[in-house]
């Protein structure tokens, strides 16, 4: 981006320019360690430290100005200092203005919910891409035609979002599709974005280390459907009790469900190991469809994507035809085993109680032998879901294999103990704290016809042990284990 004059930037954001020199601003930064000469440094509040405290480091890095809390004390700088009551909201507005309001130049679809966001956004992206250039922001990456960038968060922070959207506009994109997390909504990361289609997939237990309770979690998700963020239709899962509540609170809503009575639902759905087929019933008509996606939860994702793309004006027949060409998302019900293997191995990102339940329920009908579930729970995260996941694995699989996920700074053995507390007496799980060994053991001990589901990490290619991130990919580990299984004959 070329430099922008400070007065123009502040005026675009609705901030007072009086008593401030009109200087060139070369960029925006919220990290004092990465400030470049000429940047406007924005001191965001953190969970432990207020970013305003790092103004000396920002000045040392060449910051041309500071945006800090009106309550910050001891700031005596020779550069313009802009004090605001809400640094987080101001940051989002400054970012939008600096990048020339890119969200206004795209037709946006946003998807929120505990589970299903990634598959649903990829489905929407795939369907829209057939109509016009489309960008995607999500858990795996941010991408648009000719470009892909690895993601650090499900929804990036405000500066990064606006920069990504500006790059999409520059690349000629007409549509943008975004996973919108509850963290992002609570932290105003998507301020400045208004969505022509806003999707709610479901709400189940997760992130209670961040939100005080499920009601707070719901209210954060519901923000996406407020007039501040939504300019078009809401597409809401009516099979979810939180979705029913959400749909009743807003207008311009289409509901989707497995049952007739919703605005969008399937008729005569057939599930096979090769995918799903049936008929879509929608407010604009009916259409036969086939999809290579597997399982009932993927049918829900498909219905959500159909609703979103219909809301954006895409023709139903084009949508139905496009569904057959979407083969899935990396690390989501991803089959790692080959057709010559005598066992099936599936890697999936399921890391919540509901996600694990849906994964195992979707897999069970196609298993000839035993269903073996390798899983763990992340450290420094919601502890209450651990025994729930242990209980679900014991209930829905034939052999739970309890192991580590990302222990982070917690004792891995203590995490396993929390999981094991939910496994009923009489069930004998395999317990192996080392995830590599757990995967190897599960695959080597599986019998012909068994299916091994490795849950929790999906697309991730790392494991966090303490504060160290090491390379670790469930798919690679599974392929190595399969190779050893084949070599022993």
Swiss-Prot record:
Protein known as: UDP-N-acetylmuramoyl-L-alanyl-D-glutamate--2,6-diaminopimelate ligase
Residues reported in the UniProt entry to bind meso-2,6-diaminopimelate: 381, 405-408, 456, 460
Keywords assigned: ATP-binding, Cell cycle, Cell division, Cell shape, Cell wall biogenesis/degradation, Cytoplasm, Ligase, Magnesium, Nucleotide-binding, Peptidoglycan synthesis
First and last residue of the signal peptide: none
Subcellular location: Cytoplasm
Residues annotated as binding ATP: 113-119
Recorded catalytic activity of this chain's protein: UDP-N-acetyl-alpha-D-muramoyl-L-alanyl-D-glutamate + meso-2,6-diaminopimelate + ATP = UDP-N-acetyl-alpha-D-muramoyl-L-alanyl-gamma-D-glutamyl-meso-2,6-diaminopimelate + ADP + phosphate + H(+)
Biological or metabolic pathway of the protein: Cell wall biogenesis; peptidoglycan biosynthesis
Signal listed as a keyword: no
Taxonomy, superkingdom: Bacteria
Free-text function comment from the UniProt entry: Catalyzes the addition of meso-diaminopimelic acid to the nucleotide precursor UDP-N-acetylmuramoyl-L-alanyl-D-glutamate (UMAG) in the biosynthesis of bacterial cell-wall peptidoglycan.
Post-translational modification: Carboxylation is probably crucial for Mg(2+) binding and, consequently, for the gamma-phosphate positioning of ATP.
Keyword Nucleotide-binding among record annotations: yes
């Amino acid at each position: 981006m070329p430099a922008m004059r400070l007065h123009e930037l502040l005026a675009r954001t609705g901030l007072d320019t009086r008593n401030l020199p009109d200087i060139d601003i070369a960029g925006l930064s919220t990290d004092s360690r990465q400030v470049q000469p000429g940047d406007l440094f924005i001191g965001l509040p953190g969970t432990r430290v207020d970013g305003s405290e790092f103004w000396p480091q920002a000045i040392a890095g060449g910051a041309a100005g500071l945006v800090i809390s009106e309550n910050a004390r001891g700031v005596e700088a020779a550069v313009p200092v802009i004090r605001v009551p809400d640094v987080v909201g101001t940051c989002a507005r400054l970012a939008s203005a600096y990048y020339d309001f890119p969200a206004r130049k795209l037709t946006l679809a946003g998807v929120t919910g505990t589970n299903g966001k990634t598959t649903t956004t990829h489905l929407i992206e795939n369907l829209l891409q057939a109509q016009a250039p489309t960008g995607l922001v999500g858990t795996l990456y941010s991408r648009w035609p000719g470009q892909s960038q690895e993601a650090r968060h499900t929804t990036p922070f405000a500066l990064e979002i606006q920069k990504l959207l500006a790059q999409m506009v520059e690349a000629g994109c007409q549509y943008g599709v975004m996973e919108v997390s509850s963290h992002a909504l609570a932290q105003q990361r998507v301020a400045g974005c208004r969505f022509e289609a806003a999707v709610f997939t479901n709400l189940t237990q997760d992130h209670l280390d961040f939100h005080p309770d499920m009601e707070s979690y719901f209210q954060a998700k519901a923000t996406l459907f407020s007039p501040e963020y939504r300019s078009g239709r809401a597409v809401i899962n009516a099979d979810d009790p939180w979705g029913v509540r959400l749909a009743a609170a807003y207008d311009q809503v289409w509901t989707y469900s497995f049952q007739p009575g919703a605005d969008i639902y399937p008729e005569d759905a057939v599930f096979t190991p090769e995918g799903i087929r049936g008929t879509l019933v929608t407010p604009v008509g009916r259409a036969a469809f086939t999809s290579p996606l597997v399982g009932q939860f993927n049918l829900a994702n498909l219905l959500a994507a159909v609703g979103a793309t219909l809301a954006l004006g895409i023709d139903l027949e084009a949508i139905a035809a496009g569904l057959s060409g979407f083969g899935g998302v990396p690390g989501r019900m991803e089959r790692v085993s080959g057709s010559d293997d005598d066992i099936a191995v599936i890697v999936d990102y399921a890391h919540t109680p509901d996600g694990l339940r849906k994964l195992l329920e979707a897999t069970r009908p196609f298993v000839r032998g035993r269903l073996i579930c390798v899983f763990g729970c992340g450290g420094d995260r919601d502890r209450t879901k651990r025994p729930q996941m242990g209980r679900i694995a014991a209930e829905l699989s034939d052999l739970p294999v309890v192991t580590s996920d990302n222990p982070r700074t917690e004792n891995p053995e203590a995490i396993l103990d929390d999981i094991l507390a939910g496994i009923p007496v009489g069930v004998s799980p395999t317990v192996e704290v080392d995830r590599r060994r757990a995967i190897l053991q599960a695959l080597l001990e599986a019998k012909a016809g068994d299916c091994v589901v490795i849950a929790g990490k999906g697309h991730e290619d790392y494991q966090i042990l303490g504060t160290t991130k090491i390379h670790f990919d469930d798919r690679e580990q599974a392929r190595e284990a399969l190779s050893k299984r084949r070599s022993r004959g």
